[in-house]
């Protein structure tokens, strides 16, 4: 963790508010039945925020489980000393069965080849190893088709050393104000779990809800809510009227690397896509698509300088972006620039950047490059 006093040495950095992470977990948890747990989703480096630090903050705030997408992500948590229950949501290939068992990570099993490899390693270690089974109820990605579930789970029972602890699915449209398809998926999921019970197969943990369903559809909560984007203070959808106030955890900052006045007729950036119509004060921000700032923000995005919005002019390049600071008083070399987040009373949200980049807020934070230091505020 980097001491905040050393920030003067950075050109571009992200500040991660761990108190915001904790507050968001607690705000959602308060809305859940006491019997419902929280699974904090820290895949993709915790949506760009830093998996180890976010995992610790979420667990301290009351999350009972962690979720990742790849086995390597779970191993990294273990190597950092985090021993909380951790589910791999994505595909676990047979070749990684040893890693999963040895690090006590819970896999989502969707093939018998993986199950066989897990069982073999569990037997070698003389252990009973727990797994979860994923059902595709309408997402059309990873998971068993509903009609395959009973036979597949029955086949899993033939593998000595494996215990099926959980069955889960994922909602495709929980972020849509119209809940009809989510409820259709819920019905498919319930049909599967009832068929398993009728076959004499008891699975103790059921989970279906993501952030949007966790906040909007209590009938989907079951035993666990998988808290992803909302934990980071981002709305699952700008179309939803959320029942809790979320606090964004990430602020992306840079600083004025050069300040000058371009004469009328001078161009900025690759392709000369901006030509100054009049003398224009330009601040150079040392941030670009190499840091994760979208090139689609060229000539349309904005950043905050001295609490005011400054327009992006010219093409966003790999390492630098130019801003029109005409009309903003007292801008100086090395002044702080907020790419997204708050500066004084002003704010540019990840949703704003997503709108300019024609994408979603999830992508804006997740794409933040590894070369951008994360500074953790506690």
Model-derived segments and spans:
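C-terminal accessory subdomain/extension
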Residues: 261-378
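A structural signal for short, hydrophobic beta-strand segments that form beta-sheets
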Residues: 88, 164, 256, 312-313
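Active-site-proximal beta-alpha core segment in soluble small-molecule metabolic enzymes
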Residues: 2, 7-8, 12-15, 22-23, ...
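Anionic-ligand-binding alpha/beta catalytic cores of soluble enzymes and soluble regulatory domains
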Residues: 178-280
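Catalytic metal-binding/acid-base residues of hydrolase active sites
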Residues: 138, 172, 212, 230, ...
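Solvent-exposed alpha-helices and their adjacent loops that cap or buttress functional pockets
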Residues: 32, 100, 123-125, 132, ...
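C-terminal helical cap(s) of enzyme catalytic domains, especially alpha/beta-barrels
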Residues: 18, 75-80, 239-246
């Amino acid at each position: 963790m980097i001491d905040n006093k050393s920030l003067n040495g950075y050109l571009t950095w992200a500040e991660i508010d761990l108190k915001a992470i904790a507050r968001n977990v607690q705000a959602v948890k308060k809305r859940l039945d006491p019997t419902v747990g929280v699974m904090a989703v820290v895949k993709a480096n915790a949506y760009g925020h830093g998996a180890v630090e976010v995992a610790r903050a979420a667990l301290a705030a009351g999350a009972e489980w962690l979720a990742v997408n790849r086995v390597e992500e779970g191993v990294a948590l273990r190597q950092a000393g985090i021993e909380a229950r951790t589910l791999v949501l994505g595909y676990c290939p047979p070749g990684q069965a040893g890693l999963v068992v040895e690090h006590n990570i819970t896999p989502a099993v969707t093939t018998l080849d993986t199950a066989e490899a897990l069982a073999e390693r569990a037997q070698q270690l003389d252990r009973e190893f727990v797994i979860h089974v994923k059902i595709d109820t309408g997402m059309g990605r990873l998971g068993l088709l509903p009609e395959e579930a009973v036979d597949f789970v029955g086949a899993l029972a033939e593998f000595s050393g494996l215990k099926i602890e959980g069955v889960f699915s994922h909602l495709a449209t929980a972020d849509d104000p119209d809940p009809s398809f989510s409820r259709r998926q819920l019905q498919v999921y319930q049909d599967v779990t009832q068929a398993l019970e009728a076959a004499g197969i008891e699975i103790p943990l059921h989970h279906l809800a993501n952030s949007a369903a966790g906040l909007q559809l209590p009938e989907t909560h079951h035993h666990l809510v998988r808290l992803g984007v909302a934990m980071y203070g981002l709305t699952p959808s700008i179309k939803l009227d959320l029942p809790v106030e979320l606090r964004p955890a990430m602020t992306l900052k840079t600083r004025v690397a050069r300040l000058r006045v371009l004469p009328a007729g001078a161009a900025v950036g690759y392709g000369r896509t901006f030509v100054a119509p009049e003398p224009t004060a330009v601040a150079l921000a040392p941030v670009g698509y190499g840091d994760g700032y979208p090139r689609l923000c060229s000539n349309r995005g904005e950043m905050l300088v001295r609490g005011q919005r400054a327009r992006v002019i010219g093409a966003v390049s790999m390492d630098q972006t130019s801003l029109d600071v005409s009309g903003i008083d007292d801008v100086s070399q090395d002044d702080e620039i907020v790419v997204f987040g708050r500066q004084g009373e002003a704010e540019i949200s990840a949703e704003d950047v997503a709108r300019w980049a024609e994408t979603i807020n999830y992508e804006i934070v997740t794409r933040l490059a590894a070369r951008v230091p994360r500074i953790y505020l506690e």
